[in-house]
Amino acid sequence: SQVTTYMMCSGSDFFYVRSKYGHVMGDDLNGTLDCGCDTAQYNSFRKYYRNHLNLEKEGTDLVAYTLKRAKEKGMEAFITYRMNDLHFNDTTTHCPIWYTDFWIQHPEYWLNDTTQGYNSGGAFDFAIKEVRDRKLAIISEQLENYADIIDGYDLDFMRFIVYFKSGTGPQNAPLMTQLVKDIRQKVDEISAKQGRKILRSARVAPTVEQNMMKGLDIREWLRLGLLDFISTGVHWRGDPAMPVAKFREEMGKELNIPFYSSIDDGGYRPREFWSHGM
């Protein structure tokens, strides 16, 4: 095919392989976590964890294996990291096996703003330093673990594009810019150790205004040289009228790196088009 770059999602606060920052997705911690009466959901999570254990016994790291396979097929191999995944932070499900360690242990770090769509009340609040520090630590761990494999690291800000309380995005944008700078510094450190350049990319919203509303000052990121390429997209549902030309026009000469726009495809019930944030 004409595909040249393969990106594997490494999750967010749940992990597909062992991490010092939390347990593997589906681990019920020796039977101490369940999913209430929803045995189907519980069994689904447990199935993933059993598969993980089987691979682990064979010495197979799921992320490493997948990235190596992509490189064997002649593609660039990237990790793409969900910056604030909201799938697993709904306490009304009464399903503890869904909850990540750091999230359930620190409700004081929740955004508590339900106006931004799906599960946004339980989103991590990036205005809090401890949240940003943890994200940097997780990303740093992945960079170190897969430094000899990856060609690049992608920050997926569209999963989910909720970072600050409504109306406070622009004033908090410098905090997110500093986080991206810190990640860039870590990537550069790993690149120097490897003796080769590891690329940095980000997936963001389709317009400059939408990004700034959410605290993502992409103009400043490019001015500071924090990214090697950028992509725009929507959250899950496809948009046949993606404003690619508008993005180019808004960015002007500041768009000095390769720019891609994604094709997204997903099904929603009618009410979800707006409840899911975009």
Question: What is the role of each PLM region?
Answer:
Residues E130-P258:
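Active-site neighborhood of glycoside hydrolase catalytic domains
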Residues G31-K68, E72-K73, F78-E141, R271-M278:
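Active-site-adjacent "subsite" loops/lids of carbohydrate-active enzymes
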Residues F164-T168, Y260-G267, E272-G277:
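Aromatic- and carboxylate-enriched substrate-binding clefts and catalytic-loop regions
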Residues V24-G26, C95-W98, R219, R248, ...:
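Short, hinge-like loop/turn segments at secondary-structure boundaries
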Residues M8-S12, T80-N84, L155-M158, R203-A205, ...:
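Active-site-proximal beta-strand/loop segments in catalytic clefts of secreted hydrolases
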Residues S1-E58, S231:
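N-terminal substrate-binding region of glycoside hydrolase catalytic domains
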Residues V17-G22, R82, F88-C95, S166, ...:
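Short, solvent-exposed loop/turn and secondary-structure capping segments
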Residues G11-Y16, E56, A205-M213, T232-P243, ...:
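Acidic-and-aromatic substrate-binding clefts and catalytic sites of carbohydrate-active enzymes
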